[in-house]
From Swiss-Prot:
Alphabetical keyword list: Amino-acid biosynthesis, Cytoplasm, Diaminopimelate biosynthesis, Lysine biosynthesis, NAD, NADP, Oxidoreductase
Binding, NAD(+): G7, A8, S9, G10, R11, M12, D33, G96, T97, T98, A120, A121, N122, M123
Record's function text: Catalyzes the conversion of 4-hydroxy-tetrahydrodipicolinate (HTPA) to tetrahydrodipicolinate.
Reaction it catalyzes: (S)-2,3,4,5-tetrahydrodipicolinate + NAD(+) + H2O = (2S,4S)-4-hydroxy-2,3,4,5-tetrahydrodipicolinate + NADH + H(+); (S)-2,3,4,5-tetrahydrodipicolinate + NADP(+) + H2O = (2S,4S)-4-hydroxy-2,3,4,5-tetrahydrodipicolinate + NADPH + H(+)
Cellular component terms per the entry's GO annotation: cytosol
Alphabetical list of HAMAP family matching this protein: DapB
Name of the protein in question: 4-hydroxy-tetrahydrodipicolinate reductase
Active site per database record: H153, K157
Organism of provenance: Burkholderia ambifaria (strain MC40-6)
BP-aspect Gene Ontology terms: diaminopimelate biosynthetic process; lysine biosynthetic process via diaminopimelate
Gene that produces this protein: dapB
InterPro entries the record matches: DapB_C, DapB_N, DapB_N_CS, DHDPR_bac, NAD(P)-bd_dom_sf
NCBIfam families: dapB
Amino acid sequence: MKIAIAGASGRMGRMLIEAVLNDSDAQLVGALDRAGSPFLGQDAGAFLGKETGVKLTDDLDAVFAQADYLIDFTRPEGTIAHVAAALRHDVKLVIGTTGFTAEQKAELQAAAARIGIVFAANMSVGVNVTLKLLEFAAKHFSHGYDIEIIEAHHRHKVDAPSGTALMMGEAVAGALGRSLEDCAVYGRHGVTGERDPSTIGFAAVRGGDIVGDHTVLFAGIGERIEITHKSSSRVSYAQGALRAVRFLSARGAGLFDMQDVLGLR
């Protein structure tokens, strides 16, 4: 599997590079970084003390010409540029970027008519199994329980609520036959009045080096149920991304997510 990594100098990019180098079925053929990065020209394995022969570059076409797959955990504007290059070079994409607008998501959907794309806000096996647990719980706590989603991440995260929190909200709302867009409440401040029982609330915490904590609270009278997932390392995301690459190796064009990859549908 000839794999290139986007955002190669970042925390997630380095974790992905390490995962690819440690996988006997995978070959690192490219490492993209943003224009102006001080790491351009550096060997992709330097942070591991390894010489890979792959240099960090901002030349999209040079990287895509070598790759069969790109793994991208960057930012929406960067990912959209990578999608255009992937279409030019017929490269399949594994996308873990979050914070897309509706218009940008539509661009991913359109691109998937020509290339295979796995797009998931969270690629850990644990989170995706948790989504199934939430669907089950929501169906059984549909009356008399208020639903709140609380997430916490490191101080450097730029979007809120997290993509994973939104995935959880969509799983719960879908199980209840609702649209998350219509029932979500993002944060509360001041005199808000009594809680609307049809809503799903979101709260975001940012601080320190928290990798990612998510709790969905079903609060009833006399009891509450909490379903929580906590990430202690980004390695679970990297392993999930490689699993997604293997999934795409046997697929043609189409837009998939980790539920497809893990056979949870």
